[in-house]
Amino acid sequence: MKNFHQEIKERTGWSDAIVRFLHSREEAEIYIKARLVERRIGGRAALVRTDIDWRAFNCRQEWLKEKFADWDKWQDYNNADLIGEGWPPRDSNGDPYELHHIGQQQDSPFAELTWQEHMGDGNNAILHPNRESVIDRQQFDGEKSRYWQDRFKAFSKEEIKRIYH
């Protein structure tokens, strides 16, 4: 009988760099349901979204005026501009996409998730089975910013052309 890691590899095409960090089938199903695909971002394996609208100006949501003292600046940033500055892109509601450490180790690959995929529908307990995190949050803050900048650098010339023309 195959172990679940091998089954997930065969089903998704994800490499060992991703699959070896998975704790459970339930965790893998969250990423599969989100339709994440494997890429290398800044030299690190990651599961990335293919459904982010990079041209969208999702910071223009009215509710964000209360959250950002400098909202006037951010309203003119599309999602590609945001990640170029090291900030997460935003979904159509204006909520930022979140980065999750697959397997909850400091050197784990990242998965790009919506808040709902990350924390809602019981996913928090599935994705964070150990209540005591080993993630250095200060280091992670810097990694998140670099990750999004590296994600921008990974755009092809054709993608950049589609976003800005």
Explain the meaning of each model-derived region.
Residues 1-97, 103-165:
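Nuclease and nuclease-like effector domains acting on nucleic acids or nucleotide cofactors
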